[in-house]
């Protein structure tokens, strides 16, 4: 499995704001969108293009346009914070949803909803899950996507923990993870340290 940490001054600046416990909900949402834009730009670097003839105002020329079929699948609800930025850069992307809920007492995820486009085998599938902590939610979603034909899923996470990475290496070795940071590890409640808290709660003000 490939883990790619996106190193860029703008990523560091956005991450600093997301980590700050005093960042208000509205600012947190804007920062999440910016983080998504930066991660998506890196994660789509190798998408397939095709030559296309056009006319500029001055002369005919050949340009390259995106031809890859792209599917974005946010994990409800936290993954919704990455969807706006994704669609801003890839507006033609199809969108699916995986509803996953973590039992806070056991940190075990359960799947309660799924609605994804058909024929995932011929698509480049991006899973949007901003916090890769234990890896349970991501592994469950990737398993579900694989059952529907997806191969080589690209996981976009703002912060990852070594424990979550290790779990995916064992269960989903063909996945590529794009993240802004790999943090120290998990606490006894399975939250990432130093992390940024509960992403979904901070995104939605709950």
Label every PLM stretch briefly.
Residues 1-206:
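PRPP-associated nucleotide enzymes
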